[in-house]
Structure formats: structure tokens, C-alpha cells
């Protein structure tokens, strides 16, 4: 009857809209329901293309290699390089182009997982938009910088890691989450600095090396050279250690106006060292280390670790040397 007639223009229009939305969502999520051994992973981090290979062994490339060895497809998205290359008068910071390029990349690649590493240029709002467009995608972030209150750039690093914490499904830190009272414990996990057999190839334990102890620092991997007037507590520590241990032969860089070393020069230098000092900026905190730990262990240098890092939970006394203080370290170097 006319009274019970329901096939109005509005009803049919809503029906078409719902059908269209259902089909579009299926198209968007197509290719995201896969077996775990064949995933598409979009890895957003700084691959340092503009540095001409100086950081060819950086953590982002190590993680890429690990995913590929596990049988996954990996697409690298170098956010800082893209932002730098696409700056213009119309897009002064390059942010608009970066976000547009990310959306187009996701549309074409249809990732199962999006991984962000120090991707500060990607906003939480952009991540939320991608999650809305691709509801089946899982998103995680990794973070390598120190997060202890007495360490360098604490407030800045804290803000960086918390910036997207509510937009990602998981966060991976090189500091134990149990040592950080500001991090939600339910979706934060410890990740060690990765070593890679294609980068760490030296096997120094099989060689007769001329240098006893190697140590290198820098004033920032992107800067490359020492910054005038910058102070670093590790300089005082290492200089004191050298004075306390006159019978050991040290090879140090980034200290006393000796410039940092990079790329192939770095590996050629540590190839001649028996032992390596794993010394990170700031006070020791549970499990934290800079990525030098992977380079020292991975290349077969006997590595010294501050026992206040609690890394003896992960390494035995047969795998590393743990020291209590600088005097203890000096004595153990000479043993």
C-alpha cells in the first residue's frame, strides 16, 4: 500500500551509499589478509640517501634486511630525504608533499604493516587517517635514542616517542620499558640494537690486532663532524681511563679534536682492535645502549659494558665484560 511504501529516494540513496562504502572498504583492505610469512611492510624512516652512503649500515637498513630475510616484501620510505627534496615556495617545509606521497604510496602498495623509525615528520593525524583508510593495517614504531631523565635531550626524546603513542599498535624501544614510568606498558616492548651478518663481517676474535681498546663518538650522525664548543661527559671519562691505563693502547675518535670516522673508514679502523668500549651518553639505564653495541659485538671485539645497564640479564660473563666503575674498567682492560 501507499502507506507502507518505503522505497523512497532517500531510502534508495542510503542503500547505494552503504553498498558503495562496503565495496570501497573491500578495495582498500584488499591484499591485507595474508599469511604472516608473506607480508608487505612499509618502513618509514631516515635512510640518509642525501649523505651519499656514509651511514649505509644504519639501523633502518638492518631492520629492512631482517624483514626481507624472513620472506617479506619491504618498501623503504625515507621521510627526511623526501621532505628535503620536495621543499618549495608552495610547500616551504615539504610536509604537504611528504604526506601526499605517503598516502599515494599506501594506496599503491597496500601495506599489511607500517613501521616508523624516528619518523618525526609524520604526524599522528596522518597515521590516524591511514588507519581509517586501511583498517586492517598494523602500525608500529621503533626508537633508538636515550630516554633516561639524566641523559641528553630527555624532554625532546620523550615528546618524540609519545607523539604517536596513541596512534600506533606497538612501540619498540632500546631501553627497557620497565625503566620508564611515562610509557604505557601494555604495548611497549624492548628491542635490542640489531646486528647484521652482511655488515658485521670482521670476526676480530680470529685475528691478531694491534690496538687494545677502540672507542668512537660523534656529535650527531647527520652532522658528521665535531661541533665547536659542545661538551660530552664521555670525553672526560675516556681521557681519565687512558691516564689510568697507560699500558693499554687506545684508538679513540671524536675526542681531543680527532674527528669522528664513518662508513668504510670506520670498519677498516675497528678491524685492528681487540676490545671495544660501549659507552653511551648520559647515566646508564636498564638495557639501553647506542647502536655501537651491535657493531662491537657483531665484529668480534671483546666489549665492555657498564653493569648498571643490567645487560648481564642478556649476556653472560663469557660473552661480555661488565665493570662497576672506571677503576674496575681499567683493571679489567689489563687482565
At which residue positions do the language-model features occur?
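A short, histidine- and acid-enriched strand-loop-helix "catalytic/donor-clamping" loop
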Residues: 137-154
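Short, conserved structural micro-motifs that define repeat-unit consensus positions
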Residues: 118, 131-139
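Loop/turn elements at helix/coil->beta-strand transitions in domains of secreted/extracellular proteins
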Residues: 111, 135-138, 274
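C-terminal "capping" alpha-helix adjacent to the active site of nucleotide-linked donor transferases
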Residues: 325-335
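Nucleotide-sugar donor-binding catalytic core of glycosyltransferases
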Residues: 7-89, 93-94, 109, 118, ...
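Conserved nucleotide-sugar donor-binding subdomain of glycosyltransferases
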Residues: 88-104, 143-146
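Proline-aspartate-enriched helix->loop->beta-strand connector
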Residues: 106-114
